Amino acid sequence: MFRGVFPAIITPFKDDGSLDEDGLRRNVEVLSKTGISGVVPCGTTGESATLSHEEHKKVVEIVVDCSDVPVVAGTGSNNTSEAIELTRHAADAGADAALLITPYYNRPNERGLFEHFRKVAESSDIPIVLYNVPKRTGVELRPDVVARLSEISNIVAIKEASGSLTQVSRIIELTADKNFAVLSGDDDLTLPMLALGATGVVSVVANVAPRATVEMVNAFLDGNITRAQELHYRLAPLVRAMFLETNPIPVKTAYRMLGMAAGPLRLPLAPMSDENEAKLRDVLTKMSDLTGDMR
């Protein structure tokens, strides 16, 4: 299952700030037809930190209902009981897997990290994808802990966004004898990570250029390294544009520019600066051949 491109999708809101359920359905239906391997709702890109529990659950239910591809639902929390609740809900709603970020802010030690993920995994049979993004959480999920967690039967993959290829290499080395997948969590490192043995990406840029991202990953996995390199560099300006400001500010702004359902950001995220919005618009205009599916 964990092979290919999994866009981490945005959560569209109406002008009054409420969830845009129809817009969410339209976005997912369009993305589902672009060759992607799955969608990831309620992650960082989906503004999960500002969703109420009811909204979080509703988003998962809607995406499961309308998606033609597997759904990997974000269910992480820095409260283990809350993560268990959200993970069980995702399983009951019909999600195909759950993505769990490392507990943030309270910065658990390695024993706490292991026990957190073990407890969540034991609470449900749903496949679990670990998510390591220390720049956001303040805590590092070290390769040796990942290796221990990979021995738990339903912990089956990791989204690795540490930015360290050394770490990625070590995780793949330590889990080589397990049925355990490594997915890139950094669009700009997807190709290098594939070279180390990763099998796909949970992607931001695939929201706006899904087919090109899919082609890049598939080209590499099929052995066409030259074509994968060409697409890596072709996508590079768009990848940089997606991170002109904190994710998901640029990608949500891009969706608005492309005519997709987006709506406002929720505070404390604020609109892009005029300067960066102009840069983003320029990149989208120049790369319209890659974003045509999302117009």
From Swiss-Prot:
Annotated GO molecular function terms are: 2-dehydro-3-deoxy-phosphogluconate aldolase activity; 4-hydroxy-tetrahydrodipicolinate synthase activity
**Residue positions binding pyruvate:** 45, 202
Active site annotation, chain numbering: 131, 159
The record, for PROSITE patterns, names: DHDPS_1, DHDPS_2
Keywords of this entry: Amino-acid biosynthesis, Cytoplasm, Diaminopimelate biosynthesis, Lyase, Lysine biosynthesis, Schiff base
The annotated site for Part of a proton relay during catalysis falls at 44, 105
Q: What's a BP term from Gene Ontology annotated to this protein?
A: lysine biosynthetic process via diaminopimelate
GO terms for cellular component: cytoplasm
Specify the pathway.
Amino-acid biosynthesis; L-lysine biosynthesis via DAP pathway; (S)-tetrahydrodipicolinate from L-aspartate: step 3/4
Which EC number applies? Answer: 4.3.3.7
Reaction catalysed by this enzyme: L-aspartate 4-semialdehyde + pyruvate = (2S,4S)-4-hydroxy-2,3,4,5-tetrahydrodipicolinate + H2O + H(+)
- Quaternary structure, from the entry: Homotetramer; dimer of dimers.
Q: Which family does it belong to?
A: Belongs to the DapA family.
- Known role: Catalyzes the condensation of (S)-aspartate-beta-semialdehyde [(S)-ASA] and pyruvate to 4-hydroxy-tetrahydrodipicolinate (HTPA).
Put simply, this protein is called 4-hydroxy-tetrahydrodipicolinate synthase
Q: Which organism is it from?
A: Methanothrix thermoacetophila (strain DSM 6194 / JCM 14653 / NBRC 101360 / PT)
